[in-house]
Amino acid sequence: MDFTPPQEGYATQDALVCTIYFYAGDIIGDQTRSTGPHISTDSGHTWDHMAWDIVITNAIAVDSYGKWLYCACGNGVLSSSDGGRNWRLNGGWRQAEIQDVKIGPESPLVVWAAGAYGLFYSEDGAKTWTRPGDPQPFRYTDQVLPDRADGDHVLIGSETGLWVTYDRGSTYTRVGPDIPIRSIIQDSRNPQWFCIGTDGRGLWKSLDRGENWERVQGTGDIVNRVVQNPGDPEWLMCGLDRGVGFSRDDGLTWETSVDGFTDNAAVYALLFDKSNPQTVYAGARDGFYVSFDEGKTWHSYSDENGNVVLQNAVIFDLWQGDLYRGDEEKGSTDAGTLVVNTEPPQGEEHRENFEPGYDTRAKALIDYLVNNTEERLASLQEGQHVDLISAIAYIREGRANDALWDDIRAQFQDWGHSMFHSFPAICFYLYTKDYLPDDIKEILRENLVSHYYYRGDTENHWLMHYTALLLTAQTWPQSSASEWYTGRSTQENYDEALGWIKEWTRITSTIGQGEFDSPAYFITYMAPILMLYEFAQDPALKRQAGMVADLLLADMAAESLDGRYCGGHSRMYDDQVVLGAYDRSSPFHYLYFGGIDLTKDIHSWLITSVYGSYRCPQVIADIAHRRDRPYVHTEVKRVRNCMRYSDLLNPPVYKYTYMTPDYALGSLQGGILQPIQQHTWDVTWIGSADNTTLFSLHPYYDSYELAMFFPEDPHMLTASVQSQKSTYTNPDKLNSSSPYERIFQIEDTLLAVYNIPEATNHQHVTLYVPGCLQRTESDRWIIGHDGNVYIAVYHFGDGEWIDEPVETFPPSRRLKIPAGQTAFIVEIGSESQDGSFAQFRQLILDQAAPDLTTTDSGPSVRYTNRHGRTLEYHWDGDVRRLDGANWAFPSDMLFQSGFMDAAVNTGAISIIGNNASRLLDFNTLRIEETPVPSE
């Protein structure tokens, strides 16, 4: 905790500082807006960013010297020891979505950070961190406040209420209301007194160090921020869900002001001007406000020309004071060094056998990408550029010209700040460095080393980010800490990236992916993994990457039907749900397995496959081709990190897929397993159109779903997500999770059961039926056929048929049924299984009608299928029964079928082909191939 205070007489600068989370409606990481900590030296009329252009920032803490600054950020904790002129990124991969940061009373180097994954503590100026009291009794923490009179005494505001520690985090005690805490302050007059603002039960106060609490009446239910006027401690002000509340009598009586605030102006930050107490600043969901009459009336702040400043900025914190302007303290200028493991793992990779024709298929993909770049380059409009990764093929095939080089130079004049920029940049450099002009080499080095990049907030984001960071550190190890955008050494950056990649691999191989089996995002996993396989200097990391590529491809191959990734998916877009040809995993099937034509949608990142040395073993291609008999394939995946509303960080996901030569029926268990883009079940078949798929869904949306996975204020999340995922609230959307949906599937029969409360957004369920299905309707049964596949769907309740506009998607109809308690019963057949369609239809109609019983506890559904098997689902207790006996998913098996076998939490996965079995042991990085006895 020891530190050296600055020498007396150092220069200072009077400043007003705000933290900008992002601009409403913008995509995080977009280069057109500056976010993060901003500084004004003219009382808020003009602003400049203090750190990098793009850094999500929730809070700022400044020490009494104005020298040590800490910012709570999405990427961790930013720290500065020279008044905010130079910064260092801290926390590593274990720290993410930090919501609050505070300096302890002992020293400016003692720092507390509260975030979506708990509480962190540092005694060295944020360079290293611990999680005090781990495992902690809380997860999502929004606020932290160390007692200025006793550094061991700390209050922590979590999503489930207030916690207090008296021993610096060794133990914790729950106190106060069991409601989300949004603000904590300590009274300036008496260190025994505290106030908290809550989301749902207003303002509370304690007069005994936080042990006992009493609600303060008159503030409203949502208090985002509470502040005390330093010059008049009885003057309190609260930021509300709209506008402010203020009291001049220590909280006995309150007034509310919304005058000048927009309807969207939830107030998150408040600050009394230090020189004029009549002036108050407010940071809101939609910008920066000021009051010149003690908070009674407000207006958006403007510059000297009357232009509104920081318009639409989401501002979470404000600070005012004198910033240190003594000597700058940059990171070390010493040349960086890097130590990389050189010890190879034991054993061989066994990659000598792979599907014939690979080189021919790779050449077809290269030609496609070359032609794509040629056409793009010839038709560029102002502001447009060639795709950087597509240009790799253009360059390597000897087609580069001055127009291309000029376009690449122009791209990097306004390069973005997300992992969708850093990853393509390192791919481009490593695959073309032997062809690049020297100035472009330097442009890329400078951008990758010194240009700030946002890590993102999803699994694929982090894999791209850390792959780019590791390969950049490896490529330019001599870069000094002062050159690195993180402010840290090359070795520190490399070690952080390697640490997360290893941890992600461990989790993926033991409890499954979070963004699992997504045709849309498959490329964002394969491309980084293949880059690591190709360019990692660490032979153990190279082996690990190859094994992960094997696992991802085998996972896809087991559920691939003619190149279409079947079953339930974590993330899909509407067009990808219904357009089988628009499947970004299909080109991988084409390249590595063969057997299908080159598909319509080829992502340029496939370049990492065609120019790389990775080869998919024949044993995996065997899985993709072998469809001579039906089989059940089950998997355990995981829900992505749950920040709120879940006892488990990663609840399990259960996948069940029934594969046949003609169709695949696949499902997840239902419920919220992935926000926004979940695709819970469908049947996909080989037929006469692109959209040969049928499924149902409840088009659910709610801040509850979003707040489970995203750290922002739940009240702002729906609008924020809607601005970026425009279909989220659409009642006609084609993908959605829902807490009111459950699935029970046994082979070719499926029950989709719904229990939708009256107050829920969108009171209906949708059945999607493609136009290619030739169907009839009888006694609530929809029975149809296409190709060799027969489909029967029973619906409870009357609905409305809606035709899909042909110009938007391939022809289809949707059956829209008012919900409440309802269900669909689905049976799938085929010519080889059931004979003629007429025979199948008669078998279905001869069965007793499905039964649905509604109760206060939810529906119960019972159905006996054409095979004589009885399926029951009971909402109360989430009970599934097969032929009268309770049925459960094989929850202990990560993969289970004739093609893949792995138990949960073992890290050992067997892949079984026609003639060999391939064992991937992620614990030892050993690969074993053994012959499979012939049948």
List each language-model region with its residue ranges.
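A short loop-to-beta-strand structural motif that recurs across blades of beta-propeller domains
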Residues: 35-39, 76-79, 118-121, 161-164, ...
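Ser/Thr/Asn(+Pro)-rich, low-complexity disordered segments
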Residues: 344-464, 477, 490-501, 594-935
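Conserved Ser/Thr-centered positions that define the repeating blades of beta-propeller domains
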Residues: 40-41, 63, 80-81, 122-123, ...
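Extended amphipathic alpha-helical segments with heptad-repeat/coiled-coil character used for oligomerization
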Residues: 543-605
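Short coil-to-beta transitions that initiate beta-strands within beta-rich domains
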Residues: 51-61, 91-104, 133-147, 176-187, ...
